[in-house]
């Protein structure tokens, strides 16, 4: 299960669809409608004051991106969106997720990997490598609309692979 903290605009079609499906599964877990995945680390950040509102707001963000692309994700499966709700995520987590996504995209959708922040095509091989912008230029990684960014390392709930 991967519930991306980065903005869904970075995801390719397969990634966006997988995020939607895994988000719906996460919703069932958080609403106690299934017995599996209860201790999944990706769900830790959604165990806040109102887990239902948090996951529904997350999924509405995924739905918004899908709608922007012309996909038809069924918003009727969700509860109410709470645009005022914010969960913090560290910039280290966003950077980790962007690199994790980059590695996935290099295998299944190299042309999409070129669109990620900090990507630079290799002129000889046509592959995409991470571009080190140096200390004078910081790469901005947009978070999913549910998340507000704070400075810090990769989140403790992340299983680093």
Residue ranges and their predicted role:
Residues 35-37:
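Short beta-strand
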Residues 1-16, 22-33, 47-161:
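Sequence termini and other peripheral, non-core segments
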Residues 40:
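Conserved, mostly hydrophobic/aromatic
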């Amino acid at each position: 299960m991967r519930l991306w903290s980065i903005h869904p605009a970075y995801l390719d079609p397969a990634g966006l669809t997988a995020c939607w499906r895994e988000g719906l599964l996460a919703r069932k877990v958080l609403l106690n409608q299934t017995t599996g995945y209860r201790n999944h680390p990706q769900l830790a950040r959604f165990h806040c004051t109102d887990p239902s509102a948090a996951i529904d707001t997350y999924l509405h963000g995924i739905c918004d991106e899908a709608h922007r692309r012309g996909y038809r994700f069924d918003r009727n499966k969700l509860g109410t969106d709470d645009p005022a709700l914010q969960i913090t995520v560290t910039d280290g987590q966003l950077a980790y997720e962007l690199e994790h996504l980059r590695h996935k995209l290099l295998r299944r959708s190299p042309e999409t990997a070129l669109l990620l922040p900090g990507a630079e095509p290799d002129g000889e091989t046509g592959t995409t490598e991470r571009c080190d912008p140096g200390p004078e230029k910081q790469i901005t990684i947009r978070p999913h609309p549910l998340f507000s960014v704070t400075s810090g390392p990769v989140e403790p709930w992340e299983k680093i692979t």
